[in-house]
């Protein structure tokens, strides 16, 4: 798929500004077939500037055009697509030029589908996928090769599942969702009762399910456990990165974003519009307010009742400095006692 610069300007609602040294009519007809970074872009490609630290690359880029904000136009040596939010412009153009192949096309003869499965119009199912009894697939659902869809699961309109995904029994997935390869939704939560007086555990059947809302995206190899009694819920507009673990009965509020390798323990409720960076650990049975941000590798151990940015942990330093700091931390208890003794002496004087 290719577009002229003039067509792209219309689709992005951007203003096309051509340098005086170039022919405006010819530039408007330039064919664009791809996107690239400022450093790597060439003829027929558009770059974008959304971070000022890359602005020096505007003078040397070989892109046919660059998406820029109004304050960067003068520094641009090639045609500029000017808009207030260049990063959104990049996202919109990427959608226009996206050449990702379809997950599957039609129903593969090697797919194993139970007789009573309800299949909507224009549904695709890849090779070696197994779909059990009672499943409902809405219109335009696409399921890749090697997937398993368990008994009674429901998948909403225009949802896409890539290869080797496991959807357990009774899981419900909304419409226009995108789930990447090797994700598992609806496996048993980590529920066990200790046997009194013995080092043994009695497994607790997980009787709830998982409910995924609409317009949810889930990355590769993420795992979402089914609820013990109530359901685990991932609400509308949530985006989840790769390799996230969400335990049983967790609720993730609308439009929350969670980055890779984050772990959320059971029965925690996360509010709307939160941003959780990578490798964050969230304790179980706590509640997090709307509009909270947690920086990478934070440990969330208690309720968060107010919106804001939260951090924990220590950024990396040279090993020598870390060893000194660690040694000082170990002496804090004795140091505190000495300070208290000195305060008592000063108080007497």
UniProtKB/Swiss-Prot annotation:
Highest taxon of the lineage: Bacteria
Active-site annotation: 248 (proton acceptor)
Entry keyword set: Acyltransferase, Lipid A biosynthesis, Lipid biosynthesis, Lipid metabolism, Repeat, Transferase
Presence of keyword Repeat: yes
Pfam families (alphabetical): Hexapep, Hexapep_2, LpxD
SUPFAM superfamilies in alphabetical order: Trimeric LpxA-like enzymes
GO CC entries: membrane
UniProt xrefs under NCBIfam families: lipid_A_lpxD, PRK00892.1
Database matches in PANTHER family: UDP-3-O-ACYLGLUCOSAMINE N-ACYLTRANSFERASE, UDP-3-O-ACYLGLUCOSAMINE N-ACYLTRANSFERASE 1, MITOCHONDRIAL-RELATED
Record's protein name: UDP-3-O-acylglucosamine N-acyltransferase
Species this chain originates from: Colwellia psychrerythraea (strain 34H / ATCC BAA-681) (Vibrio psychroerythus)
């Amino acid at each position: 798929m290719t577009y002229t610069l003039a067509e792209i300007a219309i689709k992005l609602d951007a203003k096309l500004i051509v340098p005086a040294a170039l022919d405006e009519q010819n530039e408007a007809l330039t064919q664009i077939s791809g996107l690239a970074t400022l450093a790597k872009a060439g003829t027929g490609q558009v770059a974008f500037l959304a971070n000022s630290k890359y602005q020096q690359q505007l003078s040397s880029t070989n892109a046919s055009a660059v998406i820029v904000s109004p304050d960067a136009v003068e520094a641009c040596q090639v045609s500029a697509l000017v808009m207030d939010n260049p990063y959104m412009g990049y996202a919109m153009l990427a959608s226009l030029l996206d050449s990702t192949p379809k997950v599957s096309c039609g129903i593969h003869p090697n797919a194993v589908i139970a007789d009573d499965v309800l299949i909507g119009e224009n549904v695709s199912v890849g090779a070696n996928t197994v779909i059990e009894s009672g499943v409902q697939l809405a219109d335009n659902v696409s399921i890749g090769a090697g997937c398993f869809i368990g008994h009674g699961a429901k998948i909403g309109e225009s949802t896409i599942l890539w290869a080797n995904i496991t959807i357990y029994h009774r899981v419900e997935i909304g419409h226009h969702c995108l789930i990447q390869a090797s994700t598992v939704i609806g496996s048993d939560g980590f529920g066990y009762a200790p046997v009194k007086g013995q080092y043994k555990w009695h497994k607790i059947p997980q009787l709830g399910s998982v409910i995924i809302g609409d317009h949810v995206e889930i990355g590769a190899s993420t795992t979402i456990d089914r609820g013990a009694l109530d359901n685990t819920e991932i609400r509308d507009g949530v985006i989840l990165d790769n390799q996230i673990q969400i335990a049983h009965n967790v609720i993730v509020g609308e439009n929350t974003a969670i980055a890779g390798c984050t772990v959320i323990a059971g029965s925690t409720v996360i509010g709307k519009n939160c941003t959780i960076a990578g490798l964050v650990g969230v304790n179980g049975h706590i509640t997090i307010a709307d509009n909270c941000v947690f920086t990478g590798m934070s440990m969330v151990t208690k309720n968060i009742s107010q919106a804001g940015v939260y951090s924990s942990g220590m950024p990396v330093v040279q090993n020598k400095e870390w060893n000194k700091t660690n040694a000082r931390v170990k002496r804090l208890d004795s140091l505190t006692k000495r300070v208290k003794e000195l305060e008592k002496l000063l108080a007497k004087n």
